[in-house]
């Protein structure tokens, strides 16, 4: 019964979501507080807002999902929200993930039962401008009242559907997953140039970014820290 209620409730939201000024204000407050907590009120919280426009000049990935500015959330109107919902929220534009103590057959049966009556919508064809090849370095230095200096580097990589996507995923683990990873072993433990360092991928559908982020140890300049990271990347290419 609970499984049926779960799927039914989600289909009901897609079919006839309750829009009102009151519900919008409640959710607006939630998102604005999340924006403040994650992006404005903690050290390095706005790194994504600073890095994305450097990496993307044409592609919409230059916009953080939560918005570029708090005013974008504060000024959203009920009409805009409704238009967005009815443009994109449709069974022919959705992926339903079902996990738990339920068989495949039952999941299909319940999905067909509750989503089968939700009408299709004319979803616009996804045709986003592709990011042109980056031909020069883009760099930004920001001075803030933060506990430690931090270094953030990003390299363009393939999209999620490209076979090499999994190569980048494994590469990020080779560089920073665990104490024996290259960056941790060489730059944190042996040379003690960083107190912490991490490598990860963005996981984007379109061409994404390969990130390296670290906090240099006390007394280590950002220039020395960056040079050490580049040396490790060169070693990785040659070995």
Model-derived regions, located:
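Extracytoplasmic/secreted proteins, especially bacterial periplasmic and envelope-associated proteins
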Residues: 9, 26, 30, 46, ...
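An aromatic/glycine/proline-enriched structural segment found at the starts
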Residues: 57-58, 62, 90-91, 95-159, ...
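Active/ligand-binding-proximal structured segments within catalytic/core domains
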Residues: 153, 163-175, 183-187
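Active-site-adjacent, His/Asp/Glu-enriched structural segments that form or flank metal-binding
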Residues: 1-45, 60, 70-93, 103, ...
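Acidic/histidine-enriched alpha-helical segments
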Residues: 18-36, 103, 122-136, 188, ...
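M16 family metallopeptidases and their MPP-like homologs
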Residues: 1-4, 8-14, 44-71, 93-99, ...
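Short beta-strand/turn micro-motifs at beta-sheet edges
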Residues: 60, 82-86, 138-142, 197-202
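Short beta-strands and strand-coil junctions in structured, solvent-facing domains, enriched
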Residues: 16, 20-21, 104-105, 159-162, ...
